[in-house]
């Protein structure tokens, strides 16, 4: 794939890059009494001890660094107290893409470019910045930063280390810029304690949910008057905050939550949702919420995300909402399983719950992901449906988890996105249910031979047996593929040795014949694999158990298969065209060879 105008222009001349760096570690996620702009233990950007080179370097190197910093300061005509923090190789997007360097000073962001004698200088004070967010070059490559300052938008692309540059810019903006926050992060702020009451302000995510407006931008603006406390296991636990404050009616505490079920039945679930997990627990619905979803259960939620490979987990407290019941926000970094681009994608998840008649608890989630292909095309919606189970002597509950991938734009990859999302959700929720049962066994709230995990209407033992059978089939297939690869390798070695012994014209003919042969082999392999597609039947039924939900699932499956067949047909058509072109070229070479012989 060709890179989209991000390569540096040949002949560009830039000033030498600076080498002065500071430790720009982010503020620790701790609910404390210190302001967020100056947390305890965080480095000072203008502290000489953090902006100087390593102590192992001599005085000559230090003076050289200072002289370079002074040279850049004079280039941009900055105040005398400005110190160069770091510089990055990037490009500024205006009418054309200008390759150059970004120089980060304590109070300024500067950019310099010199292409064929055409100089460009840009100076952006941190005090004028109103918005900073990560962006994508051409909407695909996550290597750009967008800055809004003084009513003007600046777009910097082609960063080799975009996250490091964004972190430095973000820290400098929070320390020396305006009070507006960036990047959609749930920031740690000072809890305002007044008369023993912890006051919490709603975030803009809650306002967006109230108005039913999807938050598509990566930037979340919070006013300086808002304070959004965060429950984090890296900092002070939530209990330590509530020990010094009396419980407020506006705060959903872990142990003092007052259940107020609505005197209505839960709304019916849309047919767009697909069941991905089902389980039974031998505890009441209220106890289930307290152990796994309350403010006191954040440690369990964080341990689940860590086991899934997530990092930077943050979670707010439950807050009452007039229209949505109770809401909270969760954010984390999730690993991306692709070979290019970012290794982690930012996930912003809003959660809300309501208790209906007969202890029917419904928890709804809406998750948006950034830094992944087609991230702005879809949103992952989830529903945790928890019902009371009084059939046994001990009151329990039954959990059903449903997922829907809601698309806002059309794409030919919709089927693949939905399939991969559902598969990952099945694995994640199955792991969550296993962890929940282990926690109940540790607390002696469930027997060792108690509730069995059910996934997609299938017992765990049967699912494990089916997985083992699939593994054995996969091993046999891998052995067969290994034999084919070995034979192809030997054939290629023999072919190359034969070509080396031939003349120039014969080499061309032999290579063309080899290409045509490889194309035919590829077509045969693709057609052979197409018949054995990776299809999972998530529901087992007989001819008497077909219901509306099963028919809906079959219709969706047929739609996805139809899309996949269209893509395969397009690919085969292109391969036939390539094959015809190669065949025509081969005949042309044969005619040339005959003419040369005559």
Curated annotation (Swiss-Prot):
<dbReference type="GO" id="GO:0005576">
    <property type="term" value="C:extracellular region"/>
</dbReference>
<dbReference type="Pfam" id="PF02893">
    <property type="entry name" value="GRAM"/>
</dbReference>
<keyword id="KW-0053">Apoptosis</keyword>
<dbReference type="GO" id="GO:0009751">
    <property type="term" value="P:response to salicylic acid"/>
</dbReference>
<keyword id="KW-0325">Glycoprotein</keyword>
<dbReference type="GO" id="GO:0009873">
    <property type="term" value="P:ethylene-activated signaling pathway"/>
</dbReference>
<feature type="domain" description="GRAM">
    <location>
        <begin position="70"/>
        <end position="134"/>
    </location>
</feature>
<keyword id="KW-0934">Plastid</keyword>
<dbReference type="GO" id="GO:0009507">
    <property type="term" value="C:chloroplast"/>
</dbReference>
<dbReference type="Pfam" id="PF16016">
    <property type="entry name" value="VASt"/>
</dbReference>
<keyword id="KW-0611">Plant defense</keyword>
<dbReference type="GO" id="GO:0042742">
    <property type="term" value="P:defense response to bacterium"/>
</dbReference>
<feature type="glycosylation site" description="N-linked (GlcNAc...) asparagine">
    <location>
        <position position="61"/>
    </location>
</feature>
<feature type="region of interest" description="Disordered">
    <location>
        <begin position="1"/>
        <end position="64"/>
    </location>
</feature>
<keyword id="KW-0812">Transmembrane</keyword>
<feature type="transit peptide" description="Chloroplast">
    <location>
        <begin position="1"/>
        <end position="68"/>
    </location>
</feature>
<feature type="coiled-coil region">
    <location>
        <begin position="553"/>
        <end position="595"/>
    </location>
</feature>
<keyword id="KW-0809">Transit peptide</keyword>
<dbReference type="InterPro" id="IPR031968">
    <property type="entry name" value="VASt"/>
</dbReference>
<feature type="compositionally biased region" description="Polar residues">
    <location>
        <begin position="1"/>
        <end position="11"/>
    </location>
</feature>
<protein>
    <recommendedName>
        <fullName>Protein VASCULAR ASSOCIATED DEATH 1, chloroplastic</fullName>
    </recommendedName>
</protein>
<dbReference type="InterPro" id="IPR004182">
    <property type="entry name" value="GRAM"/>
</dbReference>
<dbReference type="GO" id="GO:0005783">
    <property type="term" value="C:endoplasmic reticulum"/>
</dbReference>
<comment type="function">
    <text>Involved in ethylene- and salicylic acid-dependent cell death control associated with cells in the vicinity of vascular bundles.</text>
</comment>
<feature type="domain" description="VASt">
    <location>
        <begin position="272"/>
        <end position="444"/>
    </location>
</feature>
<dbReference type="InterPro" id="IPR011993">
    <property type="entry name" value="PH-like_dom_sf"/>
</dbReference>
<keyword id="KW-0381">Hypersensitive response</keyword>
<dbReference type="GO" id="GO:0043069">
    <property type="term" value="P:negative regulation of programmed cell death"/>
</dbReference>
<keyword id="KW-0150">Chloroplast</keyword>
<dbReference type="GO" id="GO:0009723">
    <property type="term" value="P:response to ethylene"/>
</dbReference>
<keyword id="KW-0175">Coiled coil</keyword>
<keyword id="KW-1133">Transmembrane helix</keyword>
<feature type="glycosylation site" description="N-linked (GlcNAc...) asparagine">
    <location>
        <position position="494"/>
    </location>
</feature>
<feature type="glycosylation site" description="N-linked (GlcNAc...) asparagine">
    <location>
        <position position="329"/>
    </location>
</feature>
<dbReference type="GO" id="GO:0009626">
    <property type="term" value="P:plant-type hypersensitive response"/>
</dbReference>
<keyword id="KW-0472">Membrane</keyword>
<dbReference type="GO" id="GO:0016020">
    <property type="term" value="C:membrane"/>
</dbReference>
<feature type="transmembrane region" description="Helical">
    <location>
        <begin position="507"/>
        <end position="527"/>
    </location>
</feature>
<keyword id="KW-0936">Ethylene signaling pathway</keyword>
